[in-house]
Amino acid sequence: MDLKGKRVSVIGAGKSGIAAAQLLARKGATVFVSELGTMGAEEMQHLREMQIPFEEAGHSPAVYEADFCVISPGIPPHAEVVTTLQARNIPLYSEIELASRFCKARIVGITGTDGKTTTSTLVHALCEEDGLRNGYRAYSVGNIGVPFSSMVLDMKAGDIAVVELSSYQLERSPTLKPEVAVIMNITPDHLDRYAGELQGYAAAKFRIYANQGAGDTLIYNEDDALLREHFACRDQFPFNIMSFGMEPACKGVPDIRTFFLEGDTLVAHTPDGDEPVLVTSDFLKKSFRGRHNISNVLAAVAVAGALGIQREVVCQVIREFRGVEHRQEFVMTINGVDWVNDSKATNMNALRQALEALPATAVLIAGGRDKGNDYAAITRLVEKKVSLLIALGESQDKIVSAFKDVVAVKAAGSLEDAVLLARDAASSGQTVLFSPGCASFDMFKNFEDRGMQFKQCVHQLSSW
């Protein structure tokens, strides 16, 4: 991609926007950064250091003086700046798309509603260990928090870039071509962006394989009904297909590669027969538990199979894995009560998985900015698993109304109050589970900030 002499506007000055602007400037483009809100001092300093002009608190006409634009994923498709750019036929690309144009490394792309961060982290750990033995480097970038653009120029042929991909990022990545693509699952989420339609959300996820061909591999979750139906006619796709699942329908089918659970053993099924990989007791622990995490491990093992990573490496890395921060993260035990931070649970499916993973009953802290949640879908599970539900945030009234007839419910005015209520209610042997099931932006900067504040509150309890 030759950028010399090209004028490029970057819309949005978050981490990915700044990284994109820096990459564009290094490649010779004339760059302009435009931020609708207020920019931080650090972001402005980064741009000044590279003499990149910018604006904040609005988008001026200068934005439209561009050959193409790189747009931050959080900007909705109906935003005025987007519709104006489209009306002027100015191409819009994601930061992922931009970086991929310069990527010499092999790309492993991982998407899905839930599980993609844990799986991406695990796949990166597998590649990192394998790379130490075989002379390549592994990078973890994308939606996981490190912009692809900030690392891509360091990547060499033979390296592996593990790229976590959101639906927003995939929307505007028309030439992205992962060597290995993974779809973890597709359940209702972000439907406000897709006119309330699951099909639109799924279509964005399916863009991950749009450019794959012979020699590339698509890995999907056989347990997900939507994915199972979508990939039922494998012959219509030009790439290799592998699957994983607890009890996949293709188990025992010749010429199919799949990874499944048989009893407590993870098994690789190939045309040559079935081969046990490892048992769940090797990796399930207090800090990494639940059937959904078995699914995440199966996905990572499938990627290892596609990349040719040896079983010895797979077993070593998975046995040592301790989970990911804010994903059912064990914080500590206080007076016999386990405290678990699941701040990343921003939708109903993630909350359901957290409840299903509980070894005993729990005090549940939930709530935040509602995303059109259907709480009726988990009513029976809450009744079975929860002794007290503490409702928090903008969705507080909706949660109280949804569950007041099946479980004791209390409302909390702040996260600190919620933690104190949970402390007073929980008994030895129980868990206090912070799994909001909602977005964080009503009270916090993001889910990471929300999780950190929860952990701080818990640590303060232990010092009293």
From Swiss-Prot:
Enzyme Commission number(s): 6.3.2.9
Q: Where is the signal peptide?
A: none
Question: Under which main EC class is this enzyme filed?
Answer: ligase
Asked if the record carries the keyword Cytoplasm, the reply is: yes
A single Gene Ontology CC term: cytoplasm
Q: Which GO terms describe its molecular function?
A: ATP binding; UDP-N-acetylmuramoylalanine-D-glutamate ligase activity
Catalyzed reaction equations: UDP-N-acetyl-alpha-D-muramoyl-L-alanine + D-glutamate + ATP = UDP-N-acetyl-alpha-D-muramoyl-L-alanyl-D-glutamate + ADP + phosphate + H(+)
Q: What is its main location?
A: cytoplasm
Q: In which pathway does it act?
A: Cell wall biogenesis; peptidoglycan biosynthesis
Q: Where in the cell is it found?
A: Cytoplasm
Q: Which residues bind ATP?
A: G112, T113, D114, G115, K116, T117, T118
Is Lyase among this UniProt entry's keywords?
A: no
- GO terms for biological process, alphabetical: cell division; cell wall organization; peptidoglycan biosynthetic process; regulation of cell shape
Matches recorded under Pfam families: Mur_ligase_C (PF02875), Mur_ligase_M (PF08245), MurD_N (PF21377)
Q: InterPro entries of this UniProt entry?
A: Mur-like_cat_sf, Mur_ligase_C, Mur_ligase_C_dom_sf, Mur_ligase_cen, MurD
What keywords sit in the KW lines? ATP-binding, Cell cycle, Cell division, Cell shape, Cell wall biogenesis/degradation, Cytoplasm, Ligase, Nucleotide-binding, Peptidoglycan synthesis
> So where does this one cross the membrane?
none
Return the similarity comment: Belongs to the MurCDEF family.
**Its function?**
Cell wall formation. Catalyzes the addition of glutamate to the nucleotide precursor UDP-N-acetylmuramoyl-L-alanine (UMA).
Under NCBIfam families, the record lists: murD (TIGR01087)
HAMAP family given in the database record: MurD
Q: What is this protein called?
A: UDP-N-acetylmuramoylalanine--D-glutamate ligase
